[in-house]
């Protein structure tokens, strides 16, 4: 289940709320997703109006899992705050695997860079460049960094992925984990529209080879059905970004 689902900032998923029957739902604030929350006054979802138009399959390839990224290093710049270094910027999901007590609340935040003291710099991945208090809706943070919260059910190994959003990052900050995590606690799952490869490039100059590799990872991180300007902050298909890169993109992918 998901008590908060915002595609551009993240999710809040209390596993204890799982049940066999239908669950009431509403858009709630972070304060309403605590393990001891009383949901007696929650309203049921409303039936949407009839769709207008023709329902058809999208003409472009689907978004698929195209690579698994392993954690290369874990640091603890502050007690209880763990930084997972994935070794590579990419767009997709974290996959969290934990065996923790009931009600354990684990929060993940994402960024492309670290501060000088080794802590996460989440300002590299804020939604819409919202870096200070603003007029957001229910549950909106003052700073719109990307984060996900998982509240454990506590019945053995639990695997969590924020299925209703995606993030772009190299570093993941984990708080709320009881004990010391391992590299197996968190993996990265790269997602992108499954475009076919049409060309490759390699030469004797390692700098040029590295630039080519970086370009290809950037192309794939920025194609979720449409080519975007960036996969974390704005995620829109701006024409300027497309025009300046389309030649290189089409030489690599269909």
PLM region spans:
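Extracellular/oxidizing-compartment recognition motifs
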Residues: 1-233, 240-241
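Well-ordered alpha-helical scaffold segments within catalytic/enzyme domains
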Residues: 177, 244-253
């Amino acid at each position: 289940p998901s008590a908060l689902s915002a595609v551009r900032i993240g999710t809040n998923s209390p596993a204890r709320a799982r049940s066999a029957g239908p669950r009431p739902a509403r858009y709630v604030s972070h304060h309403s997703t605590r393990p001891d929350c009383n949901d007696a006054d929650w309203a049921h979802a409303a039936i949407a109006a009839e769709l207008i138009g023709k329902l058809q399959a999208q003409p472009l390839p689907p978004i698929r899992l195209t690579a698994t990224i392993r954690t290369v290093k874990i640091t603890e710049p502050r007690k209880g705050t763990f930084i997972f270094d994935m070794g590579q910027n990419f767009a997709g999901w974290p996959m969290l695997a934990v065996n923790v007590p009931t009600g354990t609340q684990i929060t993940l935040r994402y960024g492309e860079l670290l501060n000088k003291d080794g802590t996460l710099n989440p300002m590299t991945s804020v939604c819409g460049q919202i870096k200070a208090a603003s007029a957001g809706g229910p549950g909106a943070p003052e700073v719109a960094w990307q984060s996900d919260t998982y509240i454990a059910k506590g019945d053995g190994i639990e695997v969590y992925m924020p299925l209703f959003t995606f993030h772009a990052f190299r570093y993941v900050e984990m708080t709320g984990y009881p004990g010391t995590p391992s590299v197996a606690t968190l993996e990265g799952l790269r997602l992108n529209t499954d475009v076919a490869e049409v060309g490759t490039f390699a030469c004797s100059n390692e700098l040029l080879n590295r630039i080519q590799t970086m370009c290809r990872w950037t192309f794939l991180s920025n194609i979720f059905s449409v080519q975007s300007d960036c996969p974390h902050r704005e995620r829109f298909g701006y024409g300027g970004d497309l025009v300046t890169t389309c030649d290189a993109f089409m030489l690599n992918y269909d």
